Amino acid sequence: LDMMKVAHILKGKTVNPDVSLAIAPGSKQVLNMMADMGILGTLIAAGARILESACGPCIGMGQSPNSGGISLRTFNRNFLGRSGTKDGQIYLVSPELAAYSALTGYLSDPRELGEMPDFVLPEKFSVNDNMIVLPAPEEEMDKVEILRGPNIKPFPETAPLEATIK
């Protein structure tokens, strides 16, 4: 629903030249549905950069604002330095506010655009798990070779946690 609203706001418009709009779909399924519904093309045509569905923005990787710069974020990761810039001004906002602000170049209230239309969600959401690798059967686990470069170390062996934490 959020991506439908964002596409509605951006349709036929161009992101402000002083703004870098990056969109990170939450999963490969969301990205596929955005493509199927024409949303992806609308976002790209408006000037949005589409990021890989992976741990990126929420771990502070990529799209770091300049020192003292402002960044609007629509995901729930917000603490000092999380954006990758220790003195960045990071604001948590709705996708609608982020999209409209990307057009204007400043913090803008999307209600200025008027009422949003009623969006109809698909009856069925696509699920495509073809890239998920399931664990080997237990009887074959000893045969699985984990390939590591010289800078990747295995997890340290630790004792099980106690039943309670004091």
Please annotate each region the language model reported.
Residues 1-166:
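Fe-S-dependent hydro-lyases/dehydratases of central metabolism
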